[in-house]
Swiss-Prot record:
Protein name: Putative RNA-ligase
UniProt entry keywords in alphabetical sequence: Early protein, Virion
Family, similarity comment: Belongs to the asfivirus M448R family.
Domain of life: Viruses
Factors inducing expression: Expressed in the early phase of the viral replicative cycle.
Organism of origin: African swine fever virus (isolate Pig/Kenya/KEN-50/1950) (ASFV)
Amino acid sequence: MSNESFPETLENLLSTLQTKQQNAIQSEVIKWLHSFCETFHLKIHCHKQFIPSGEKKWPKIPTQETQENTQPPHHVHRVVLSRAQPLKVQESLLTTMCNGLVLDANTWTCLAVPPPAPFQQVTRQVQHYYRNKFYEVAAIQDGTLLTIYYWDDPEHGPSWCLASTHGYDVSNYCWIGDKTFAELVYELLQQHSTCNVTLEKNKTRGTRLFFNELNRDYCYTIGIRHHNLQPLIHDPQNIWAIQSTNLKTLKTVYPEYYGYVGIPGIQSQVPELPQFELPYLIRSYRTAMNQAKNAIKNGKKEKEYFNYGYLLISRAPAITKSISIVLLKSPLLVFLQKSVYQKKYNISSSLRLEFIILQNYLMQHFRDNFIALFPQYISYYMKYQNMLNMIIHSIAIKDKDHPFAGAVVKKVLEDIENAENIIDHTTIQNYAYQSKYAMLYLSIITHF
C-alpha cells in the first residue's frame, strides 16, 4: 500500500479511524492501524481487555502488550503510537507526533498528545533555518517525559494516567527500586508545585493519581527528574511544564504563551537562551563530560555544571515541518543514555540498578567515566572486583563444580576453547571482564 493511501495529519488520522469503525469491527480497524504503523516505521502498543489463551484474564492491573504484526483477538481500549527508529528529514507532521500518542480505541479520539519526536542531526537545512532565526534555543534537562491525561477505565474507574514515549500508562511501572512512576510524580509535585493531588495505593488497582483542579479536556506534558530514574544525584531533582493540549481542538499551548492551561505551581521548561552561532553551541557542550566529572569531584550540586546539550525549537513549524525540534546531545547525555537509560534486558526494578553498575564495571571504556559520575557506587565496584578475582581463579583451575560459579566457569571455558585461545591468566581475565556475562554474574551477586 502506498504512503498516499494514509492520512498525513492527526485530524485526518482520527477521522479515518472513526469512519472505519462505523463500517467494520474493531479488529479490522486495528489491522489497518498496524498497516499504517508498518508503512511509517512506527510501533503500536495495545491495552487489551483479555489475553488469547482460553478464559484467562489479564491481571487486575492492566498490562500493555506490544503488537508486532498480529491482530488483537479481543477488545482494545487504548493504543499508543511511538517511534521504531530515529526521525528522518522528510517525514509528515503526523508521524513526528507519534512519539507516545495515546488514542481511545473505543471512540478514536486523542487521550495524550506528546511533543513531536526530535530530529537529531545538524543538516544543511537545519543550519539554514538556524541562521535565519527560525529556532529558539533551550538547554536540555535530563529527565523523563510524561503526559498526564484523564481516563475512565472500564474495569477500575476514572483516574489520571501517565503516558510515556512507549506506554499508554506507566503509573504502576517501577524503573529502579520499588517506587512507581505515580509515586515519583506525586513526590515531586508535593515538593515543587501547589496543585491539589492525591495518590491512591490499592492492591488491585495499583498506584493512581487524582487531580482536583485539572481540566479533563486537556492533557499535560511534564518533565520529571527523580534520582530513582536519573541517579546522577549531584544534579537536583525537579519537575517542569512542557506543554498542554486541548483534546477537543487539538491545539497545543506552551507555558510561556497566552492561553496556557497548566498544572498549578510548576515552572516552565527552561528559559530561552541567547542565539549563539551554531558552531559555538556545539563547542560549548563538547567539554560537558569533563565539566560534570570535575563538578562532582569538587562536591558541586548546582544544575549549571551539567550540560546535556541544546534543543532547537522552531518558531514556524509549518515551514520547518519534521525538523521543528532538533536535539543536540552533549557527550554527557550520550554517555548517560548508553550506560544507564538503555533497557537492554527484561530485568526487575529491584535488580536494575545492580545490573547497570555491573555492566559499566565490566566495560573498560565505560568503567572509569561511570564511577566518576556516580561515586556513590564505589562499594559495588569493590564487590565486583572480589567476585571477578574468585571467578578468574575458578576458571584457571577449571572448577566447573563450583557451588555458585560453576555455570560461569563452564561458559567462559567453552567460549575460550571455541575461539581456540590458550587458557592462560591474561586470556581468562580478558574474557571474564565482558558485559555479555553480566546476567550470569548477576546470579552470583547474592553471595557477595
